[in-house]
C-alpha cells in the first residue's frame, strides 16, 4: 500500500507530558486527543493505545515513550507521553529533549512529589524552554484553599529551577472526567490547548544550521534497507543527500534514499521533526543508537572535553556521598550512555552532592559533539549530575 503524503501546512510544535508516576500523564494525553478530536477534528486515542508498554503493562506503569498527534486551529502538535517511573529516567532524558514545551501534570490530591522535582530538574537540564502546569484530579478536591496551596507549591518549585513559576499558565482540571465527556472538564482541556497555543512561541527552528539527527532506533525493512529514526536536531535532510554517521565507531558515509514521518512519506525532514531516514548501502549492524546522522564535515567525534557540571544533591535523588578523582560514571549524550574518566581541577580533592564543579572528562568511545552540548551523568541508570560541554580538548 502506498503511503499518504504528509502535508506540512500548520506550524509543527513538539510537546509532552511530564510529572510524578500515577499523577495522570497518560490519562491527560488521552483526554487531549479525545477532546480536541471532538472540538477541532483529528484522531482520538484511547488510554490503552497510549500506554503501550507491554513489558510493564501488568503493573500499569508506562515505560516506552508514546507519540500522539493532535491539532488546534493554528497548530499541529506532536506529543510524547514520557514515562514517570524512576527506573525509566533514561527514556525521560531522550523524551524531554524532544520538547518545545512540556505539560507538567501534578495531582491536586498529592501536590508535588519527588519525581515532579526530578522532571522539572531534567527539563531544565535538557533545555525544555517552556512548562505549562495541568493540575489534575481537581474533581476530587472540594477545598478551594487546598487547591490554592498546591498551586502555590508547584509555582514555587518551578521558580526554584529558574522557570517563571509566577507567570506560567496553570490549568486546574480533571483528565478522567474530561475523558468521560463531562463538559466543564472538557472545557479545561480546551483551555490547556489554548495555553499551548499562546504560551509556547512558535519554535525558532535551527533549520539553517547543518543537518544533524541523533539516532534513537535502527530497523531493517525487507526489500528497502536500513531505517534510522530520531528527532532532527538541526538543518534539513532531503532525499539523495549524502550524510555521515558519526560517533562511537569510525565515521562512515551513506546516502539518504527516503524520509518518513508518522508513517507518511516526505521529500525532506526538518529540524524539530521526528523522522525515519532510509539509508542506502548501510547494514543494520553498522549503525547504533547513540550515533548521529550529520551533514558531511559538520561535526566531529571527540572523547575529551572540559565541562561545567552540577552534581545532584541527595534530596534531588543524587548521590549520598562525595566522589573523588578517578570517578568513572556514565555520560549520557543525546540518546546513549558512554563511560568516562573524570579529572577534577587543581586543588579539588572531592565533589559533594549539591556542588557545581568544572571537570575534564575522557570518554571510552568518541561522541559527536560541539560546545554547548548537554549531558547527564548517571550511575547504574540513576541520574546523579547534569552538565554542559564547555570546551573540546580532543
Curated annotation (Swiss-Prot):
Positions of the tr-type G domain: 10-204
Family: Belongs to the TRAFAC class translation factor GTPase superfamily. Classic translation factor GTPase family. EF-Tu/EF-1A subfamily.
Top-level division of the source organism's lineage: Bacteria
Keyword GTP-binding belongs to the record: yes
InterPro entries per record: EF-Tu_GTP-bd, EF-Tu_GTPase, EFTu-like_2, EFTU_2, G_TR_CS, P-loop_NTPase, Small_GTP-bd, T_Tr_GTP-bd_dom
Subcellular location: Cytoplasm
Broad class of the protein's primary localization: cytoplasm
Region entry G1, spans: 19-26
Pfam families per record: GTP_EFTU, GTP_EFTU_D2, GTP_EFTU_D3
Catalytic activity, EC: 3.6.5.3
Binding site for GTP: 19-26, 81-85, 136-139
Binding-site positions, Mg(2+): 26
HAMAP family according to UniProt: EF_Tu_B
Function: GTP hydrolase that promotes the GTP-dependent binding of aminoacyl-tRNA to the A-site of ribosomes during protein biosynthesis.
GO cellular component terms, A-Z: cytosol
Residue span of region G4: 136-139
Catalyzed chemical reaction(s): GTP + H2O = GDP + phosphate + H(+)
Keyword field: Cytoplasm, Elongation factor, GTP-binding, Hydrolase, Magnesium, Metal-binding, Nucleotide-binding, Protein biosynthesis
Segments of this protein annotated with the region G2: 60-64
Species whose genome carries this gene: Pseudoalteromonas translucida (strain TAC 125)
Segments of this protein annotated with the region G5: 174-176
Description of how the protein assembles with itself and partners: Monomer.
Official protein name in the record: Elongation factor Tu 1
Chain intervals for the UniProt region annotation (G3): 81-84
